[in-house]
């Protein structure tokens, strides 16, 4: 038998075996129906869609035996209470961001996004190969939660401002919709953090109730129309260098799954995680050009502002580490890898990207 014939027959044989195995698996697989509470509205299709990717993959892999029904923010529980509903068993799972629960325990935020942490590539490396998933779940177990990465936006923008800010002095008295760790850091520089629900941000900006707001990035931000009332779009979002969205599962419900279903669930989470970042990388370039065409003025945060924010963030970290052992354990792990990651990132990746950006700006791409 020649090699080509052997490969063809092997492929056919493998396909036949899979076809025979699939019905057998379907017949023996238990029926599971879960509800997932998303922290996001359906209008933000890329980030909300992460849960739909998970649901679709699980249904297809189990011939419909493992179903996860996805509900948008507010349909079952308020978006910022999704993890609480999982802890209590009101729902089996949620799709949310850990920093929403900063007030419960700042440790929730570490595996999601905190100031001057890792990039999307860096945080993914830490999660999957640096023990990050296990460290986070060790902490979450006290809340009856098991979590896996379920999406990443890439580094976010720094927000929409009604006026320019060029120095730290310009931040004094600035009313900005920003919360959690970032709000605590900015407060030290004179900013007055505001907690405002997503649907109330636009009118607050329009009326001047707030001077600025952070959100996500070009694709999502354009949909909300902030450019119409706040022309200055600053970058980067130093508090969200690689924000991870998580799928959080009720620990008892997760442990009640068969080993096969647990494996399929983790695989689907991983696929949804990768897919979201790919979508944002695909959609943001078009969106940023559209925003600029509509009058948006892009502005980088000045080195003075970034350095001041970095120093203030380190002060907050020191306070957290001194008072919260769980926070310190995870942050120590992230810090150690952050140093290694940026040692490598500044060599090949940074120089390649820098060269290509020069070519782009010269009109050669």
UniProtKB/Swiss-Prot annotation:
Na(+) binds at residues 156, 214-215, 240. Substrate binds at residues 99-100, 156, 177. InterPro entries: DctP_fam, SBP_TakP-like, TakP/all3028, TAT_signal, TRAP_DctP_sf. It comes from the Bacteria. GO terms for molecular function: metal ion binding; organic acid binding; protein homodimerization activity. Pfam families: DctP. Its main location: periplasm. PANTHER family: EXTRACYTOPLASMIC SOLUTE RECEPTOR PROTEIN, PTHR33376. Belongs to the bacterial solute-binding protein 7 family. This is Alpha-keto acid-binding periplasmic protein TakP. The gene is takP.
């Amino acid at each position: 038998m020649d090699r080509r014939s052997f490969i063809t027959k092997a492929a056919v044989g493998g396909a036949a075996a899979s076809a025979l195995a699939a019905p057998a698996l379907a017949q023996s697989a238990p029926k599971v129906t879960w509800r997932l509470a998303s922290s996001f509205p359906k209008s933000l299709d890329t980030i909300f869609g992460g849960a739909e990717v998970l649901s679709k993959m699980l249904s297809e892999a189990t011939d419909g035996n493992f179903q996860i029904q996805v509900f948008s923010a507010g349909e079952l529980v308020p978006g910022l209470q999704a993890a609480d509903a999982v802890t209590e068993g009101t729902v089996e799972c949620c799709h949310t961001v850990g920093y929403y629960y900063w007030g419960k325990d700042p440790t929730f935020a570490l595996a999601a996004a905190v100031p001057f942490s890792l990039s999307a590539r860096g945080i993914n490396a830490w999660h999957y190969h640096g023990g990050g998933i296990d460290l986070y779940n060790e902490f979450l177990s006290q809340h009856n939660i098991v979590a896996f990465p379920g999406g990443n936006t890439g580094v976010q923008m720094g927000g929409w401002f009604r006026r320019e800010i060029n120095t730290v002095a310009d931040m004094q008295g600035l009313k900005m919709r920003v919360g959690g760790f970032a709000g605590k850091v900015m407060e030290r520089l004179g900013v007055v953090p505001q907690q405002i629900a997503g649907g109330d941000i636009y009118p607050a900006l329009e009326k001047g109730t707030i001077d600025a707001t952070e959100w996500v990035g070009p694709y999502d931000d354009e949909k909300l129309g902030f450019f119409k009332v706040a022309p200055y779009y600053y970058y980067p979002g130093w508090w969200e260098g690689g924000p991870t969205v998580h799928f959080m599962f009720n620990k008892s419900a997760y442990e009640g799954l068969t080993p096969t279903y647990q494996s399929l669930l983790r695989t689907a989470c991983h696929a949804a995680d990768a897919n979201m970042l790919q979508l944002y990388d695909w959609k943001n370039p078009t969106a940023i050009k559209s925003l600029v065409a509509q009058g948006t003025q892009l502005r980088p945060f000045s080195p003075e502002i970034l350095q001041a924010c970095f120093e203030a963030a380190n002060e907050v970290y020191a306070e957290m580490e001194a008072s919260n052992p769980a926070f310190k354990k995870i942050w120590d792990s992230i810090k150690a890898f952050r140093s290694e990651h940026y040692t490598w990132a500044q060599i090949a990746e940074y120089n390649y990207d820098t060269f290509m950006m020069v070519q782009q700006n010269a009109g050669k791409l």
